[in-house]
Design a protein with these regions (language model features):
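Glycine-rich beta-alpha junction loops
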Residues: 67-69, 152-155, 222-227
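Glycine-rich, acidic loop regions that bind phosphate or pyrophosphate groups
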Residues: 1-22, 137, 141, 163, ...
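Thiamine diphosphate
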Residues: 72-156
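Hydrophobic, well-ordered secondary-structure elements that form the walls
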Residues: 53, 65, 104, 120, ...
Length: 274
């Protein structure tokens, strides 16, 4: 009501150059997002997982995103349609929030489809146990669909990248590596549906299957931790620290350099439609 009351006091500006510039920048940004997501990675680019979700996002979805790289991809890539609700980990720092957030959303709105976006670190912290709660209650829901996307990159990836960019330190494997775990098979074992994807050409079809499922789904995306979570433009200081980390002998140096070059090229090289 307050905004509507202000409308009569607004003056139309004939000079639309600033608006056109913003619109052009937004179009360029979404082109860049898609091009980066379509770049290959070993075994799978996490950006592709979120891009394919964004294309299929139902209006009844409730998205929850955990602390970590899932919050980065959620914030950059997913286009929120009218009606879609979303929630991030409080303060963007509390690991393990996305799974219980999604479960709570399902109890509050049983006819909607919560989609939890979490990493393997948070899933191992408390998410696996929370799935037992889902297994107990899902048959009581009017719509049984709830999806738990797990980025399985075997790494506490957000902190790994923060160490490289903010401190110039290489990845410390003893603190950053986490055990590989069969999330999809675990889901199957407790009566849920498990879907595991490690090839880009299978991602879209896997989302279609998850969104049409007749029970809760654990969507395990076996992704690369080498894809940089950096924005398209970084400061000189960040670039210096990144280079320093690699010079000190990062164990994932080859993959990190390869993916960083691909991401930068997507922002520098001409677009396919230009």
């Amino acid at each position: 009501q307050s905004l509507r009351a202000l409308i009569p006091y607004l003056e139309y500006k004939k000079d639309r150059s600033w608006r056109k510039k913003i619109e052009s920048n937004v179009r360029d940004w979404w082109k860049l997002v898609e091009e980066r997501a379509m770049e290959s990675a070993d075994p799978l680019n996490p950006e592709r997982v979120f891009l394919e979700l964004s294309k299929r996002l139902p209006e009844t979805a409730i998205l929850t995103a955990d602390a970590g790289t899932t919050a980065n991809w959620y914030g950059r890539i997913v286009k929120m349609k009218p009606g879609v609700m979303g929630s991030l980990s409080g303060g963007l720092a509390t690991m393990g929030a996305a799974v219980p957030y999604a479960i709570a959303a399902k109890f509050a709105h049983p006819s909607r489809i919560p989609i939890c976006c979490t990493g393997d670190g948070a899933m191992q912290m408390n998410g696996l146990n929370e799935l037992i709660t889902v297994a107990k209650y899902w048959k009581r829901w009017s719509d049984p669909r709830i999806i738990f996307l797990v980025l399985n990159n075997r790494d506490l990836n957000q902190v790994t990248w923060e160490m490289r960019i903010e401190q110039g330190n290489p990845k410390l494997e003893v603190t950053q590596n986490i055990p590989d775990f069969p999330y999809a098979r675990y889901a199957d074992s407790i009566g849920l549906m498990g879907i595991r994807v490690d090839r880009p050409e299978d991602v879209g079809r896997a989302w279609d299957e998850a969104l049409a499922a007749n029970r809760p789904v654990v969507f395990e995306a076996y992704t690369s931790g080498d894809v940089p979570t950096l924005p398209p433009h970084i400061s000189f200081e960040q670039a210096k620290e990144f280079s320093s980390a690699l010079l000190k002998g990062d164990p994932d140096e080859v993959g990190v350099i390869k993916q960083a070059v691909k991401s930068m090229a997507a922002g520098i090289l001409p677009h396919k439609d230009e």
